[in-house]
Design a protein with these regions (language model features):
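N-terminal ligand-binding/catalytic initiation module
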Residues: 1-124
């Protein structure tokens, strides 16, 4: 099902431009927007308050290096990531991701579509 709402289409295009090279994240945002379209059509207040803009844009993205020495004495440097989306309901949740196959788009996808809804319903 294609998105028809002009506001959602515009926001999706802006999200694509701000997150190039992150196809998994863009796919997840597209799916979320598709499912939220009926709600957005009925709730102008969500648009006025910029709720969806805040959903797709993290408050902070931290990328850092992690130097380490393997068992053979060889030095390696990996990247670590921490993405923090919204502190409105309390302290950030979620950990730091260090696996070599991970990149920023995957972290944003996981945190935005999996952890955030869980964190909204779980007691702190």
């Amino acid at each position: 099902m294609a998105i028809k709402n002009e506001y959602l289409l515009d926001l999706l295009e802006r999200t694509k431009k701000r997150n190039p090279g992150e196809p998994e994240f863009i796919q997840a945002v597209t799916e979320v927007f598709t499912s939220l379209e009926p709600v957005v059509e009925k709730r102008q207040d969500l648009i006025d308050a910029g709720v969806l803009e805040r959903i797709v844009e993290p408050e902070r993205q931290i990328i850092f290096r992690v130097p380490w020495v393997d068992d053979n004495g060889k030095m390696h440097v990996n990247r670590g990531f921490r993405v923090q989306f919204n502190s409105a309901i309390g302290p950030y949740k979620g950990g730091i991701r260090l696996h070599p196959s991970v990149y920023l788009g995957i972290i944003k996808l996981f945190l935005n579509t999996c952890s955030k809804p869980k964190n909204l319903i779980m007691p702190r």
